Amino acid sequence: ECGYLYFLPGLAPDKNHYAAQVGSKMKVESSEDGVSWYDCGETNEKSHVFAWQAYNLEHQGKYVRLTALNEKVTISEAALLPAAKDKVPDIKAEGPGAEYLVDEHETVPLYKTYMNSSYFDEIYHARTAYEHILELEPYENTHPPLGKHIISLGIRIFGMNPFGWRFMGTLFGVLMLPALYHFIKNLFG
């Protein structure tokens, strides 16, 4: 019995490879037999990119059907969790390209935390750094892009995950300390 749908909203280039295509508006249905389907509602369109989302299934069942409600829906990974949330079971997906939704079930967390999702301003900066890698028009353009290009180096080295988008900022913060020490020492003698 499935109690929760977990999914990770992502982004992909649009048809013209100009801007990012982002969306998570899906119709969710569940079934015990795969024939009679119960409407469980719709997911939120305003989900944060690269942050795991949990959707409570109103009607628990053995089967879950997801239907994209617009062409912008981009989901990187999905999983079904039992109501007890004690483990992430293996699931089978059917439909064109559906196998890619469930191919990394071992990466699905039982709970959303800062260790597995973007939070605070990372929803802008990690996303924009990834858009720079994909050579897309950046979503966030209020700050100069140098910082996001530096973040994108960490993503290129370690992948599009929390470690990848946090590494370069941490490294530059550590390297800044000796520079700051010498600057202050020279300033005050």
Where are these regions (language model features)?
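Aromatic, loop-rich ligand-recognition surfaces of beta-strand-rich domains
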Residues: 1-39, 46-114
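Sec/Tat-exported extracytoplasmic proteins
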Residues: 9, 133-136, 157
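Extracytoplasmic catalytic/substrate-binding loops of multi-pass membrane glycan-assembly enzymes
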Residues: 94-108, 114-126, 138-150, 160-163
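Regular secondary-structure segments
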Residues: 126-134
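Conserved hydrophobic/aromatic pocket- or pore-lining residues that grip, position, or stack substrates
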Residues: 129, 150, 184
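Transmembrane helix-loop junction
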Residues: 131, 156, 185-186
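Transmembrane-helix motifs of polytopic, lipid-linked glycan transferases
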Residues: 163, 167-188
